[in-house]
Amino acid sequence: MNGDDAFARRPRAGAQIPEKIQKSFDDIAKYFSKKEWEKMKSLEKISYVYMKRKYEAMTKLGFKATLPPFMHNTGATDLQGNDFDNDRNQGNQVERPQMTFCRLQRIFPKIMPKKPAEEGNDSKGVPEASGSQNDGKHLCPPGKPSTSEKINKTSGPKRGKHAWTHRLRERKQLVIYEEISDPEEDDE
C-alpha cells in the first residue's frame, strides 16, 4: 500500500480519524440517512467527498456545474446558501460573487481579447460576401480602399473577420524556398 492513499485507508478499531477527513465525511454525511451512511464502505464515502470537491471547484471558477446526484436527495442547498427547491425565499440567499472580466482574462489569457470590442466598430468596415449575390467579389467605389487594403491599415478589434492578421509580420528580405525531394522518389 502506498503512503499517498492515507485518505483511503480504513482506521483501525479504536483509532481516531484525522480531523480533515472527519470534517469532509461530516459534510457528505448530511446528504444520506444514518442507515445508508453506515452501510457505505469508506471507498464510496471518499468518492462522494471527491465529487463534492470537484463541484465546489467548478462553481468557484464560475462554471455552471451540474449538482452531483447525491446532493439532490435532501433538497440540498448549494455552496453559497441558495436554496434550489425554494426560489421564493429571497431573504435567505447569499449573493454569489460574479466572475469579472479581469479574472477571466487571467485564467484564459490567450482566449479572451485584451480589450472588449467597441460596439460601433464590430465588423461594419469589412463587408462580407453572401452566397451567389456577389460571387465572392466586392465592388469598391473609386476613391475608397479595397477590403484587403483596409485589413492592412486597420489595427486592433476593428478588423472583424481577419483578427489574426496582426500577428503576421512582413518579411524584410525576399525568401526563396526550394523543393526538397524525398530519397525514396529519387530511387524510382
From Swiss-Prot:
Q: Where is this region: Disordered?
A: 77-188
Where is the sequence biased in composition, kind Polar residues?
145-155
Family matches, as InterPro entries: aKRAB, KRAB, KRAB_dom_sf, SSXRD_motif
Pfam annotation, one family: SSXRD
Phosphoserine carried by residues:
123
| Function, in words | Could act as a modulator of transcription.
Q: Which residues form the KRAB-related domain?
A: 20-83
Question: What family does this chain come from, according to its entry?
Answer: Belongs to the SSX family.
Recite the UniProt keywords alphabetically: Phosphoprotein, Transcription, Transcription regulation
One GO CC annotation: nucleus
Query: Is the Secreted keyword given for this protein?
Result: no
Question: Where expressed (tissues)?
Answer: Testis-specific. Expressed in a melanoma cell line.
Q: Which segments show compositional bias classed as Basic residues? A: 156-170
Q: Where is the composition biased (Acidic residues)?
A: 179-188
Q: Which residues cross the membrane?
A: none
Q: Which domain of life is it from?
A: Eukaryota
Q: Which GO terms describe its biological process?
A: regulation of DNA-templated transcription
UniProt name for this protein: Protein SSX7
